Structures are given as structure tokens and as C-alpha cells.
């Protein structure tokens, strides 16, 4: 069935208007307004809906999820603090309702909101809580994976669990719906709904290993390939490509080296001091002894040059070389050997990082688009690459600046013949290795099906969606959709959520690069950034 591009988002009494990022949306006098292509405005500050008026909670929010060619109404929150058998945790009530005209006789609505088969195979699930100010993420701890299907007009009450939350408000990443700010309340708060805590926890079977929040991390790559940077809460790590900064088998800095090192120096100069570790690495072409010496010499050359570009007096320095002993990737291809020839600079400020992105200073220009390009609100129509597999239109009206993040909800609509393949296989995913994420970590199925290829082009850098690493997991996941298995028919629509680091710009450029087995490059320009 075809779905409308408009959707109604209302607040409950007692809740701030700054609650929901909706698409399509416009900033209008008096509030945040959503509108459809026909221009009919829908004001998010409207009176409570009938469903909200009948609810016992005065702090829940009506939202809409658009996926699988259907529109689902979801009553969200508030997040409720509870205790059970001496353990503190939180429960997020979600009441999901299908429309009366739903096409399918039954639908697993829980899989849309909580994740389906691929998510059940691991710890990562699409439903998450975000603290944009503190750069933290809570993943739902729910282990339950089997739910009753829902027919047209039917409803399902879900009670996913999370660990304890110490914030007053959090932003819910509601898969295929948006970013919804909800209050966090105690169980005895007048705004809290009545909950059967024992039953909710018994059904959820919470995973204790996922109780604690994890840090949001930021990854960027210079467009000229000279550097890549990763920022966590404690440190910033910059890989400087040796092929740019040094000649072959040499420890003498090239004339182009400063293009890479100035950006590193600016990052260091933004902090008052701390620990600075500079480590050289090589490929495995020469013998061990030669590579060890070369890596040490290159690390020293970088340290000396950084000391001339910025004051390192307040930094405790460690300069060393690892030779070929710690490759970033396998040395079995030229591309792999090139990645391993690097000098790693780890900046650990005494008071931690300030969530700032690592920015290069090389002056590389934004490359020409290799696929369809349009302004974000207009939308770009994309064919299925060289193989001609389907067609979709990608649209992004705006992104919301909240805390240290930019939050976007893209609208994906099937074109002539539809998408033909799942949205997570080429249309929106990172076009690198099939099961690997952008860092080269083996990610499994939820890496394959994620919309982790939605990058920003800013200055001289390509900036990836923020990501995070759950306990006992070996690979990071992007703060975006994780299980895009749906295949859109002609006219069917799905919404896709994604969070990026704040670039500090008034408009952004979203770029899905070429590459991979199913290359589908496209670009959206002039996407407004609005305060949230």
C-alpha cells in the first residue's frame, strides 16, 4: 500500500513542544510544523489526541512509524524508573497500532520497532535511548524476540527495558519513526503510567550486560586520504597516512606532510594538555628489523613536526614504533598494505575530549557527485546503479541540532518498479566490505543491513554517522537504522533515522558514496539545520 508523506505528532499536556523531529517538517512561527507534499500543515503543538486523552499518562507522545509500506501509530513513553529484586532499571511503554486499512492480514509490528531476526542474533537492536548532551547511548536490554502479530486496526503494547537512566530527559530513536524527546519519571510520579513491572520484566528477560550506557564515538576521513580521526569520550585518535607524509621507505617528511599534520596540531591545540602517544606502523614488505627502525623514525619525525606546529609543553609524550607487528588490516592486498603504512597520534586530554570532530587541514575539495544530486527537500531519484536494480527517491527536509548531534529522518519512496532489493543492501549502506563496518570491523548481519553509508561532506572531510560499541561486542554500530530488510514497492515509503556529529554548519550535504557490490551513489545538498 502507498503511504502518505505527512504524519501527525502531538504532545501530551505538561510536556515541552521540543519533543519530536519529524519529516517532512518546517520551522514556522510559533512552533515546529510538519506538512505533506500538498502543503497541509500539521502543528506539533496541537491538543492531545483521543488516544492520549484516554491514557493514564500525561507525558506520553503520539508518533508515527512508516515502514513496510504501512503507517503505524505509536504512543511513546514516558521512560519510567523502576526497581525489581534490588536492581534499578527503566521501562519505556510503547503502544503500537496499525491503521484500519493495513494491506497485510497480519504484521509483526514488534519487529519493526524492536528489530527482527537479524537483531535477535546479537546484542544490537534498533530501539535506543540517546543523551545528546552527554554523548551517551542506552541499548534496550530486552531479550524477548517472539510477539503476537497484529491485524489491521489492531494494537500491541510493548514494554522494552533499559538500564538505569540518570538524565531528566532522553531522546528515543524510534526506528522508522524519528527522534522523540521523552521525560524520565519515577514510578510514583503523577505522569507515570500504571505498569505491571513484574510481568513486563518477566516478558522482557533483560540482559544485564547491556544495562550501562556507552559513549557515542565520532569518525571522519579526510577527502584526500591523508588522515582519519576517531573521537571518544576519553581520547582522539588520528591515523596519518604515511604515503602522504613520507616518500617510499623514507622517514623524511614530504612537502605535503603539513597538509595532514596541521589539522592534528589544531586538535591538540584545542586542549590544555594531557597524554600524547605517537606510534609508527609499516606494512610487511621489508624485514622485521628494517620496518621496526623505519616506524620509530617516522614517529619521531611526526612528533618533532607537531612540536613546531603547536605548543606541546603541557603534554606528556610517548613516541614509539611498532614496525609491522600491529597491522590495521591484513597485508594481503596493496590497499591493505597502504592502510597499514601509518603514524597513529592518540590525544588523551586530562579532562577528556569535548566531542569535537577531528578536522583535516589539507584543503581538499569536495569531489564531484557520481550519482543523482538534488537539494534535500526536493529529493533525488536514484536508479539501482549499473545493474539497474529498481528505483527509489531519497528526501531530507532538515536536520535537527540537539546537543552535540545532528539528527535526520530521511524519507525513502519506491519509484518505478520499486526498490527490488532491501534498502539495507546498497541504497543506504556503507559501500565497503559486505559484513564490515567503516572501521574494518567484522560486523555481521546488522552491519550488512544498516544505513551506515549516509555520510556528510563538510570542508575537507567525509563524516560518518556517530557509532557506539556495546559490551562483549567486537564491532561498532552506527546510530542509525540497523535492520533495513524491507523491499519497497512503487509508491511505498519508509523513514530512516540517522545521527551525525555536529559540524557547526547552517546547512549540510548528505552523500552516499559509490562502491560495493550494489553501487547506488546519490547526494542531497542544502539541507537546513534547525535548532532542537
Enumerate the predicted regions with their spans.
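Periplasmic peptidoglycan-binding/anchoring modules of Gram-negative envelope and division proteins
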Residues: 222-235, 245-279, 303, 307-308, ...
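Surface-exposed edge beta-strand/loop patches
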Residues: 62-64, 148-214, 349-352, 367-384, ...
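Periplasmic OmpA-like peptidoglycan-binding domain that tethers envelope proteins to the cell wall
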Residues: 281-358
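Second-shell loop/turn segments in exported
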Residues: 147, 245-254, 288-292, 484
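The feature marks short-to-medium sequence segments in extracytoplasmic or secretory-pathway proteins
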Residues: 85, 99-151, 267, 402, ...
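Bacterial lipoprotein signal-peptidase II cleavage site
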Residues: 35-44
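Extracytoplasmic low-complexity, Pro/Thr/Ser/Ala/Gly-rich segments
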Residues: 44-117, 121-124, 133-134, 190-244, ...
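N-terminal secretory signal peptides
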Residues: 1-15, 19-33
